[in-house]
A protein has these predicted regions:
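Catalytic histidine-centered segment of alpha/beta-hydrolase-like enzymes
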Residues: 99-113
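C-terminal alpha-helix
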Residues: 111, 115-122
């Protein structure tokens, strides 16, 4: 689930959920390995690894200006670590607190695009 449970429940009727399940069962293009590989990629990404596991050393290696965009209700990639690292590198931070969760850019596209454009103009 890429959105919050509240958003999913508000947007998904019982009939829609059953149709989605039926479609997934009959969709030969659906491959559960895709989700497994995405999870493995997220778990393997450790910016501190080249620095002996030190987040402080990793942060000190960042020289660029950084904008971090997080959805506070993201249940797929929790925002805490990105926010902590952002603080360590003095990144600009855009936090959005809505029920779209991991689908933040779908729900708040104009806001995110505007923030990125403004950041790039600096």
């Amino acid at each position: 689930m890429l959105t919050t449970p509240q958003h999913y429940n508000a947007e998904t009727t019982r009939e829609k959920a059953l149709q989605s399940l039926s479609a997934a069962k009959s969709d030969s293009a659906y491959d559960a390995n895709n989700h497994i590989r995405q999870d493995q990629a997220m778990m393997a990404l450790d910016v501190s690894e080249p620095f002996g596991g030190s987040m402080e050393k990793a942060a000190s290696a960042v020289k660029a200006k950084v904008l971090i965009v997080v959805a506070l209700q993201d249940h797929t990639v929790t925002p805490g670590p990105a926010m902590e690292f952002g603080k360590a590198i003095r990144a600009e931070l855009l936090t959005v607190n809505n029920e779209c969760g991991h689908q933040l850019t779908s729900c708040e596209n104009d806001r995110v695009v505007g923030a990125v454009a403004e950041f790039l103009q600096q």
